[in-house]
Amino acid sequence: MATFKVVISNPKNGIARQIEISGDAAEKLIGKRIGDEIPVKELGINLSEIFGQEIPEDAKLKIKGGTDKDGFPMRPDVHGPRRVRILLSRGPGFRPKEKGERRKKTVRGNTISPEIVQINAVLVF
């Protein structure tokens, strides 16, 4: 049984809240990719209670990224739920110290699997 920490950001006011999802709701997230939108009703989350303000019921969560159990970040350009070492020059998982620097880094693919611990999502109205 998978359990995820989901960080939900509200772009209208800049507030982010972290919730924990487990059980059937977590099973619905497995197999989704970065960029996919999931209706909040499908997950059984009451966002109005979490954010303390009125959120429309037809709101969706757009998956923006996440990290696995060992802290490796998800990258949208690596397909599948696998972990892989790739040569990076910029983007999620790498901050160059010098201009033009490239380095091999371990990152996680763009698909949610049971090894993922944290999922970053943004509200879409």
Curated annotation (Swiss-Prot):
The keyword Cell wall biogenesis/degradation does not apply. GO terms for cellular component: ribonucleoprotein complex; ribosome. The keyword Transcription regulation does not apply. Keywords: Ribonucleoprotein, Ribosomal protein. InterPro entries: Ribosomal_eS6, Ribosomal_eS6_arc. It comes from the Archaea. One of its GO terms (biological process) is translation. GO terms for molecular function: structural constituent of ribosome. Belongs to the eukaryotic ribosomal protein eS6 family. PANTHER family: 40S RIBOSOMAL PROTEIN S6 (PTHR11502). This is Small ribosomal subunit protein eS6. It comes from Thermococcus gammatolerans (strain DSM 15229 / JCM 11827 / EJ3). The gene is rps6e.
